[in-house]
Amino acid sequence: DSALPAYVNLPRSLSFGKAAYLGASYNPFSPESDPNSDGFQVRNLKLPARVDLARLGRRRDLLGSLDLIRRDLDLDGDIKGLDSFYRDGLEMVTNDKAIKAFDINREDNKVRESYGRNDLGQSCLLARRLVEAGVTFVAIQAGGGWDTHGDNFKQLKDNLLPKYDQAVAALVQDLHDRGMDEDVLVISFGEFGRTPKINAGSGRDHWPGAMSVLYAGG
């Protein structure tokens, strides 16, 4: 569905997890905003007030003409890779499907509370909305603080795990209640594990030899 991005990164884009040599058309779309914040909205999904569809069409035609200039210099295919990226972007701003999918305020307040009123909880809820609308892949950054080289146990107990447990449990339950659990695979993991040995600062260091992965549904 070209009215929706195939790959969304929540809540913000990262320095990694992008398309690299595959080209810009495979990069994730990101709202670059916390869905738990007041007045959350995704920028540039609506046309400016002074730009109607006819004017947008003329701009698109002009851009297409300019893009044809010296295509022979595009040896790496960078410009060609942007073509589908632009086409999908135009489809998104001329169709209200993406606007509705990203409008988390359409959710009942009880549902929002069940996920947790924080960036992780609301990102998980927004991910469910996006998948339900037709987005095929959503990646969520669980926030900072997980690199617990110091004070590991207190950080996990008081801050990190309560938000994580609530958000992931609510997502899995919500998918099940909506009959989506057999079609949607939830995967939760970090890039490596933590050392079995506790260091002098009550922390656990990097341990690439073993890690845990949670799978649900799908």
List each model region and its residues.
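Ligand-binding pockets and gating/stacking loops
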Residues: 1-218
